[in-house]
Amino acid sequence: MLDIRLIRKEPKECESRLQKKDPAISLERLLDLDKTVRQLKADSEALLAKRKVLSGQIHKAKVANENADALIQEVNTIADQLVAFETTLQEQEALLEDLMARLPNYPDEDVPVSPDKTGNQMIKSHGEVPTFPFPPKHHMQLNEALQILDFKLPAKTTGSGWPAYCNEGVLLEWALLTYLLNKQQAHGFQLWLPPLLVKRDILFGSGQIPKFDGQYYRVEDGDRSLFLIPTAEVVLNGFHSQEILNEQDLPLCYAAFTPCFRREAGAGGAHERGLVRVHQFHKVEMFAFTTPEQEEVVYQKMLHVVEEILSELQLPYQLSLLSTGDMSFTAKKTIDAEVWLPGQKAFYEVSSISKCGDFQARRSETRYRDAQGKLHFVNTLNGSGLATPRLLVAILENYQQADGSVVIPSVLRPYMNNQEILLPKTVR
């Protein structure tokens, strides 16, 4: 949520900044509604003041045994006006709040302006894209022999886009997750296994709704609805909603492992088959609450963790600064870490590290008290640390051998009983 006071003070500047993300954004209707709401409040306060004066006059008239019928009639008329004003005010405030809730975060000044991902800037490249002395296989082709993933059986029970891990695929997935969690803990992140279902207001606080309403799996629980989380960012942000934190306790750096649920799987087309885009996947998510002064330090820390993981896995990767048209609704700056997938012949995002400023904190009402006792909104940051499906794809495709086997990265072997290689089922 943005600060309405700044929009009132600098409407043109705010509109210009927002149009970097979406050129169609106009603040004209919002400002008109804001004026209407403020005028209604002023008129209501004037009527309340007038009623108070009249009530005093009625009291004096009664004490003096004077006729107060006209005064009483005027007070009754004011009461009816106040009821009408309150109804109109509630309607106009709801419209204003909805417009405010649909405005994205302002992008930082150093973010490239572009309508889409073509404006993203590659800021770092690490490792060499592998060349194979044989035709490299897509991970789905490798899986035919390895048999570590199953897409047919879960398609019967649930539908397409819901893969199941099996055999050594289960062990490799858990090895990867254990390694990721250990890495987060080593860097001082507090580990969490949070709930997978959240209330609607928690989705609102993280910025998922109302803009993306209807894109989340919903569970009916009696007279209320709960939603399956698309990322642990949602629940971690909600942990301190409507709270006042102490400045000396900041930054709070959390890392959570959760399954994530997204309805848009398959949106990338048939070429993104397999694990590249699915409805349910595992992810370790980093999330932090900071002061504005701590924000950049924690941001660099998150970037460092992601780079360390990809370097230790010995996967070729690049970092891209996202343009305004490719950033999320809540972010003011995002750097994507992308790994090379030979099967796609392209780099694919495995982590997004974002600064959100006080955007989510305003929606969630998360503040901190400084040493002087003043209240401020916290800043929030988030970053995938990391999502495993594409990471697993990257391992399978980059570590594949001519015979269809896959070498297990050395950093994962301690979590797989020191197993060094995945062999095709036919040679096991």
Swiss-Prot record:
PROSITE patterns: AA_TRNA_LIGASE_II (PS50862). Keywords: Aminoacyl-tRNA synthetase, ATP-binding, Cytoplasm, Ligase, Nucleotide-binding, Protein biosynthesis. It is found in: Cytoplasm. InterPro entries: aa-tRNA-synt_IIb, aa-tRNA-synth_II, aa-tRNA-synth_II/BPL/LPL, Ser-tRNA-ligase_type_1, Ser-tRNA-synth_1_N, SerRS_1_N_sf, SerRS_core, tRNA-bd_arm. It is an enzyme of class 6 (ligase). One of its GO terms (cellular component) is cytoplasm. ATP binds at R262, R263, E264, V278, E349, V350, S351, S352. Pathway: Aminoacyl-tRNA biosynthesis; selenocysteinyl-tRNA(Sec) biosynthesis; L-seryl-tRNA(Sec) from L-serine and tRNA(Sec): step 1/1. Homodimer. The tRNA molecule binds across the dimer. Consists of two distinct domains, a catalytic core and a N-terminal extension that is involved in tRNA binding. Catalyzes the attachment of serine to tRNA(Ser). Is also able to aminoacylate tRNA(Sec) with serine, to form the misacylated tRNA L-seryl-tRNA(Sec), which will be further converted into selenocysteinyl-tRNA(Sec). This is Serine--tRNA ligase. It comes from Chlamydia trachomatis serovar L2 (strain ATCC VR-902B / DSM 19102 / 434/Bu). The lineage of its organism: Bacteria, Pseudomonadati, Chlamydiota, Chlamydiia, Chlamydiales.
